[in-house]
Amino acid sequence: MIKQRTLKNIIRATGVGLHSGEKVYLTLKPAPVNTGIVFCRADLDPVVQIPARAENVGDTTLSTTLVNGDVKVDTVEHLLSAMAGLGIDNAYVELSASEVPIMDGSAGPFVFLIQSAGLEEQDAPKKFIRILREVTVEEGGKRATFVPFEGFKVSFEIDFDHPVFRDRTQSASVDFSSTSFVKEVSRARTFGFMSDIEYLRKHNLALGGSVENAIVVDKDGVLNEDGLRYEDEFVKHKILDAIGDLYLLGNSLIGEFRGFKSGHALNNRLLRALIEQTDAWEVVTFEDASTAPISYMRPVAAV
């Protein structure tokens, strides 16, 4: 049986919020079966919990924000991408502020944290959402689609009219039966244009952004001294973002996601459209792991 997974141990980290610039304390904790991923604002009394579900998404302007009433948690997508990539079904994410720390702008540090905490299988079957037919949403020349696929695949195309992007791959398709999320996707960093960052800072956004946690592009090229981690790091980061956004379904996917210039808003619209169209998907479990179209790394012991 493919079983649900949680963390073996509690683990903590400190970072800054990308948009707030605030110092944030992050604690990842194990959770019981069928809990899902739950964000907890530990700085509030009483603590406010926000389950990582598509219906709890509020603002999607620059990141994916979860809301519960007037309480929010910003920038959840990179941590959720790491949770999805490592097959974590159940965990509590405690935060001391309203934003998940940006770390280095990728999911890599979160992968390291989760692997350091160790993974533990739980005595309950892991639930997958299997796509049964195509579902598409479009808006302003952007498109996001689910199609049936025996496995998990993410295809993405970006289209930036800028020399840095024109000279590099702007499309990628990753089939996770043959490609490692950890090696090929998790280290892709978020990116931004110098001109946009100056505008955002005037509006009290991207206050924590720097070349330490983002790829910064100006009219001449990439400003980061070390350059890119992957030749196709820009589109790979869009795939990373999409994996995090898709995990707001609450379960791992069996199917393919195709994005064309899609962002957090359209990704969430696609999830909501899928949820409403109940004939387009089903929940499945696997008694025999060898028959499943998706496999996960064996649980690792805590470091």
Swiss-Prot record:
Pfam families: LpxC. It comes from Pseudomonas syringae pv. tomato (strain ATCC BAA-871 / DC3000). Belongs to the LpxC family. HAMAP family: LpxC. Its EC number is 3.5.1.108. The active site is at H264 (proton donor). Keywords: Hydrolase, Lipid A biosynthesis, Lipid biosynthesis, Lipid metabolism, Metal-binding, Zinc. This is UDP-3-O-acyl-N-acetylglucosamine deacetylase. Its cofactor is Zn(2+). Zn(2+) binds at H78, H237, D241. One of its GO terms (biological process) is lipid A biosynthetic process. Catalyzes the hydrolysis of UDP-3-O-myristoyl-N-acetylglucosamine to form UDP-3-O-myristoylglucosamine and acetate, the committed step in lipid A biosynthesis. One of its GO terms (cellular component) is membrane. The gene is lpxC. One of its GO terms (molecular function) is UDP-3-O-acyl-N-acetylglucosamine deacetylase activity. It is an enzyme of class 3 (hydrolase). Pathway: Glycolipid biosynthesis; lipid IV(A) biosynthesis; lipid IV(A) from (3R)-3-hydroxytetradecanoyl-[acyl-carrier-protein] and UDP-N-acetyl-alpha-D-glucosamine: step 2/6. It catalyses: a UDP-3-O-[(3R)-3-hydroxyacyl]-N-acetyl-alpha-D-glucosamine + H2O = a UDP-3-O-[(3R)-3-hydroxyacyl]-alpha-D-glucosamine + acetate.
